[in-house]
Structures are given as C-alpha cells and as structure tokens.
C-alpha cells in the first residue's frame, strides 16, 4: 500500500484550521499538530500511487499550507 509521511508548514495562526481542513482529505489516515520547525505531520495511505499523488496534491493546494516535505515509505 503506497504510504507517505508529509511534514507541513502552515500559515502562522492557521495551524489548527489547517489541521481541521486536512484531516478530511481522502487517504489521510493520521494527522498530528506539532511544535517546532513543522506544524503538522500527516500519514497518507492509498491503494495506488496515483491515488497517493492525488491526495498529496490536495494537501499542497490547501490555502493554509506554505510548504510540505514528503517522505515516501519504502516497504
């Protein structure tokens, strides 16, 4: 199952709003607020690489997302 960890930098003051929006994104299995360099970590699992890529694209297109760092999991 294609899986990726996504680290997210959100707009200042919009971290919780971003969390609420992204938790309903298709294929998002887990999401956590962080303190430190990144604001969120998201675990995305999909049935196909195409579905994974589509979910990653939706995350990146969120208006409150400034930057993402994606780490695909090799099984």
What are these model-derived regions, one by one?
Residues 1-75:
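A compositional/biophysical signature of low hydrophobicity enriched in polar/charged and small residues
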């Amino acid at each position: 199952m294609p899986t990726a960890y996504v680290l997210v930098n959100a707009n200042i003051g919009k971290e919780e709003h971003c969390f609420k929006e992204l938790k309903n994104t298709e294929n998002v299995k887990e999401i956590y607020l962080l303190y430190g360099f990144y604001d969120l970590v998201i675990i995305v699992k999909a049935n196909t690489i195409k579905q994974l890529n589509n979910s990653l694209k939706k995350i990146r297109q969120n208006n409150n997302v400034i930057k993402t760092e994606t780490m695909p999991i090799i099984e």
